[in-house]
Amino acid sequence: MLIIIRPSGEIALKSPRSRRNFEHTLANNIRSVIKEGKIWRSQGVLFLEVNDNNKNIEELSKVFGIASFSPVMSIKSYNNNLEDIINKAKEVFAEIVKGKIFSVRAKRIGSHNFTSLDVQRKVGEALYPFSRGVNLENPEVEVFIEIRNDVAYFYYKIIKGPRGLPVGVAGKTVVLFSGGIDSPVATWMMMKRGSIPVILNFNLGGSVHRKFVLEELSVLRKWSGGHKLKLFIVNGTDVLIKLSQIEKRNRVVMLKRVMYKVAERLCDKANAKSITTGESLSQVSSQTMTNLYVTEYGIKYPIFRPLIGFDKEEIVELARKIGTYEYSIKLPEYCAISTKARTSVELDEVLKDEENLNIDYEKVLENSEVIEI
């Protein structure tokens, strides 16, 4: 089976050097997902040759960096002969257009003694007797012929990919992963921009919390382009005991700040260059503009919040698409540790609390459980 893979449009806009790098990473990710076969680059697309019974082909729809892909039939050399293309088109498409209203779409790369319009017209005439008619604007079925120099490719399916950039081209980011609805979606969005997530989870709910986090990450692993996901599980109950020493109104923001501080240490350890969270502006009390400012104050790495402008319905819709929603919805809210959380905490108070708590963030990270998924 031969498959033509069309990379995301933005990859084509990169400089030649960056484009080669992105396409090389995409090819490696595809190899990791498909497990076998031959892959090569040619004139802005990738070709993948695999066994006909390969069951991993559908996984291409979850490989970031792919705009679309199509299983194709081909004539490897037709000597600039349009008649060969017409005959092959009848062989491939006669059953596809049978009893249906159809259209032919053709495009060419290279020099030929015929135009793309010639191909569409002649192939359309040859297929017409098998069909119920032609409609270029609203066909029941479309058939495609793509001519690249001395090879013609025939296909009738265009399967959409997730677009974005190949996972790995943007380096690593440490993701604060609660396991609720938001953090898996934020992780997915960072992978879509080419980042490899390093997962940091503060376990506040014991074995139940751990179970659902692992299930969510198993879903996200299918979108990772073959990259393994490394999970660091911190014992969050020890942190909560510490936080009981400060005023209730500051505890939620202080907990988030502890998470940021541990994430900062993990960035150092994992050679990650950013921290990612699932925070959305003004969604809850800890996510007001003021509280986000206090939470990230003094953190040396950039904080990415891919959901910052999303409302809850939009986030839920994405979670359903990704496949994590069914697990996230079963997980209790563990970060709601205070019913008196303020929407505007004082930076001076939080910094004083932080000094008094004197948490050893390095030790918190050292005592974490590490799992590779």
Swiss-Prot record:
Keyword tags: ATP-binding, Cytoplasm, Nucleotide-binding, RNA-binding, Thiamine biosynthesis, Transferase, tRNA-binding
Function as written in the Swiss-Prot or TrEMBL entry? Catalyzes the ATP-dependent transfer of a sulfur to tRNA to produce 4-thiouridine in position 8 of tRNAs, which functions as a near-UV photosensor. Also catalyzes the transfer of sulfur to the sulfur carrier protein ThiS, forming ThiS-thiocarboxylate. This is a step in the synthesis of thiazole, in the thiamine biosynthesis pathway. The sulfur is donated as persulfide by IscS.
Record's catalysed reaction(s): [ThiI sulfur-carrier protein]-S-sulfanyl-L-cysteine + a uridine in tRNA + 2 reduced [2Fe-2S]-[ferredoxin] + ATP + H(+) = [ThiI sulfur-carrier protein]-L-cysteine + a 4-thiouridine in tRNA + 2 oxidized [2Fe-2S]-[ferredoxin] + AMP + diphosphate; [ThiS sulfur-carrier protein]-C-terminal Gly-Gly-AMP + S-sulfanyl-L-cysteinyl-[cysteine desulfurase] + AH2 = [ThiS sulfur-carrier protein]-C-terminal-Gly-aminoethanethioate + L-cysteinyl-[cysteine desulfurase] + A + AMP + 2 H(+)
Which InterPro entries did the record assign?
Rossmann-like_a/b/a_fold, ThiI_AANH, ThiI_fer, ThiI_N, THUMP_dom, THUMP_ThiI, tRNA_STrfase, tRNA_sulfurtransferase_ThiI
The text of the family note is: Belongs to the ThiI family.
**Cited PANTHER family:** TRNA SULFURTRANSFERASE (PTHR43209:SF1)
* Its EC number(s): 2.8.1.4
Name of the featured protein: Probable tRNA sulfurtransferase
Sequence ranges assigned to domain THUMP in this UniProt record: 54-158
Localisation: Cytoplasm
Q: Which GO molecular function terms does the record list?
A: ATP binding; CCA tRNA nucleotidyltransferase activity; tRNA binding; tRNA-uracil-4 sulfurtransferase activity
Q: Which biological process terms from the Gene Ontology are attached to this UniProt entry? A: thiamine biosynthetic process; thiamine diphosphate biosynthetic process; thiazole biosynthetic process; tRNA 4-thiouridine biosynthesis
Residues binding ATP: L176, F177, N201, F202, K256, G278, Q287
Specify the superkingdom. Answer: Archaea
What cellular-component terms does GO give this entry? Answer: cytosol
Q: Which Gene3D superfamilies match?
A: 3.30.2130.30, HUPs
Protein's pathway = Cofactor biosynthesis; thiamine diphosphate biosynthesis
